[in-house]
Amino acid sequence: MRYELYYWPTIQGRGEFVRLALEEAGADYVDVARRRGKRGVPAMMTLIEGARIARPPFVPPFLRAGKLVIGQTANILLYLGGRLGLAPRDEAGRLWVHQLQLTITDLVVLIHDTHHPITGYLYYEEQRAAAKLATKHFWRHRLPKFLRYFERVLDKSGGPYVLGRKLSYVDLSLFQILEGLRYAFPKRMKRF
């Protein structure tokens, strides 16, 4: 099956977590909004507006898989995980990696809020003072708590990945989190 990924063409954002899973698995997919002309962003906007679809997505990223349209990063990864060999096949295992991905989703919100603590509608420069305060608290309190949790998960797994010796979409998402932090906070991340 050829998957269609819909996400903004010029940023990695939440769509990158899905892209990494698709790429790692060697899945057949097209990044729709990166197409030119009407087949790109306008095609994505048509689905968002929902005139031709019974269950329209709210915002990107979303994935079209045959007749299904699946929104929300963690939900997309839950769907793709077993199909791409990036999640366990048993229910308990699938729910475990989904739980970890939802925890990553919480962390993504906190990371975003270091640059946009007041609102996403203002540029960073317009909320710089609040961003500095949010960043201070993020680094002092929130990020260490999340990192300790994922270190514990990895320690208990018995292998280099959250599932032990098998790579999962959560491992790819943790990679993306760390790379994103290195990009957004290069000086602070040198300490890690």
Please give the residue ranges for each predicted region.
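Amphipathic, well-packed alpha-helical segments that form the structural scaffold of globular domains
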Residues: 81, 151-155, 178
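Amphipathic alpha-helical packing segments from all-alpha helical-bundle domains
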Residues: 136-155
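Glycine-rich, acidic and aromatic/proline-enriched surface loops and short helix-turn segments
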Residues: 103-106, 152, 180
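Conserved, non-catalytic sequence blocks in retroelement Pol enzymes and Pol-derived host proteins
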Residues: 65-67, 164, 190-192
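A short acidic/glycine-rich loop-to-helix N-cap element
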Residues: 130, 185-192
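GST-like domain detector, emphasizing the conserved glutathione-binding G-site
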Residues: 1-137, 141
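Surface-exposed helix-capping loop/turn segments at secondary-structure junctions
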Residues: 86, 152-165
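GST superfamily/GST-like fold recognition
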Residues: 97, 161-188
